[in-house]
Amino acid sequence: VYKCDLSNQEILDEYMNCDIVSFPSLYEGFGMPIIEGQAVGRVVFTSDLEPMKEIAGDAALLVDPYSIESIRNGVMKLIKNHHYRDDLIKRGLENIERFKLPVIVKCYMDLYTKLEREN
């Protein structure tokens, strides 16, 4: 179902009403649905392409977005293997920690400090 112009609350509601966040994108600048889904405790499957692999870390099932079979097998694995799904959800909740504002700010401050020392 395609929906547009959703409020932040409506977006959150959509995530909360799903079981699996399906994001087999061919190209993205960042891949917000990955961390949005992980942040609300949903299992995510996404493309085995950058930047999705970097954003997802080891906390999402990666599939070949050009292969219907890979996507189908990924979905079936998430449906049938409860332990694997629960493990990905746990790792997803851990993964989102690196995208929280204080962590990002610290990374930038460390970079600026390093650059200042080098000059």
Pin down the residues of each PLM region.
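Active-site donor-binding acidic/aromatic loop of nucleotide-activated sugar
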Residues: 1-7, 14, 61-62
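Aromatic "clamp/platform" in nucleotide-sugar-dependent glycosyltransferases that forms part
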Residues: 26
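Short acidic/histidine- and often glycine-rich active-site loop of Leloir-type glycosyltransferases
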Residues: 34, 49-62
